[in-house]
């Protein structure tokens, strides 16, 4: 036997085997699915909490003429209020909307009111509160003013919800003898004792307040023990607002 030839053949066979072994592709290692702990949670939407809502019936000359609704929500450290006010006067609609934003203690940060506050009268005003100043809008005109130490945003007797919030603010901020109002004016809020009224066969006691400065004359408001406005009377306008 020719051993030299056999060795050469063996070398060729081994070389071929090695080449075939190293030519085999590596198997793909399956990727491990991320666990629930390693998966990033989607960002959560801001939590908006519904705090309060209510409805008032509007009366003029002791006749039902419309209604006012409001909703208060909390978003973090802020409160937002949306108000719809609408009544009918001599066959014509008188719609009014207002939005209000504040800190949780009712310190105002923004206010806007737009629509009709009487059959022949319109309003379009806004207030934006900054750290040291306030921006006031009357229709298309903006002006700046110094920020008062204590104040509330309101523009007239309507909507009644804003009067309710103003009394709450006043009562929780030292009950000042006078309170500045924006976009303009000052009001005087005074407690006037309590009245007991029969409601659904039982007696209920309400706190009575008066407000001067929003409209000619003096308004009277009644609140329950939870600081909810129950009734508002505006004698100069012959208007009464009653919670439903």
Where are these regions (language model features)?
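Solvent-exposed helix/loop surface patches that form functional interfaces
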Residues: 49-51, 65, 117-210, 226, ...
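Bacterial N-terminal signal peptides that target proteins for export
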Residues: 2-14
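Signal peptide processing junction and immediate N-terminal pro/mature segment
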Residues: 23-36
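Hydrophobic, proline/glycine-rich low-complexity stretches
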Residues: 34-69
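Gly/Pro-enriched, hydrophobic low-complexity segments
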Residues: 82, 86, 95, 99-101, ...
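Transmembrane beta-barrel architecture of outer membranes
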Residues: 67, 95, 161-166, 218-220
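Bacterial N-terminal signal peptides
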Residues: 12-24
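N-terminal mature ectodomain segment of secretory-pathway/periplasmic proteins
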Residues: 59-138, 225, 232
């Amino acid at each position: 036997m020719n051993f030299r030839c056999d060795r050469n053949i063996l070398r060729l066979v081994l070389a071929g085997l090695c080449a075939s072994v190293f030519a085999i592709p590596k198997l793909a290692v399956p990727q491990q699915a991320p666990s629930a702990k390693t998966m990033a949670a989607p960002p959560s939407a801001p939590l908006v909490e519904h705090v309060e809502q209510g409805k008032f019936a509007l009366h003029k000359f002791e006749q039902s003429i419309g209604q006012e609704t409001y909703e208060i929500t909390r978003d973090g450290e802020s409160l937002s209020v949306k108000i719809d006010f609408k009544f009918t006067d001599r066959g014509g609609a008188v719609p009014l909307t207002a939005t209000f934003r504040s800190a949780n203690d009712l310190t105002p940060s923004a206010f806007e009111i737009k629509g009709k506050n009487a059959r022949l009268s319109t309003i379009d005003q806004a207030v934006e509160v900054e750290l040291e100043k306030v921006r006031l809008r009357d229709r298309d005109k903006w002006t700046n003013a110094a920020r008062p130490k204590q104040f509330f945003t309101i523009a007239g007797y309507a909507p009644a919800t804003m009067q309710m919030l103003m009394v709450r603010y006043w009562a929780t901020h030292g009950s000042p003898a006078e309170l500045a109002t924006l976009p303009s004016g000052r009001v005087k809020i005074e407690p006037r004792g309590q009245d007991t009224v029969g409601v659904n066969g039982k007696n209920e006691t309400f706190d009575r307040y008066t407000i001067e400065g929003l409209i000619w004359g003096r308004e009277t408001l009644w609140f329950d023990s939870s600081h909810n406005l129950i009734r508002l009377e505006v004698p100069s306008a012959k208007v009464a607002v009653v919670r439903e």
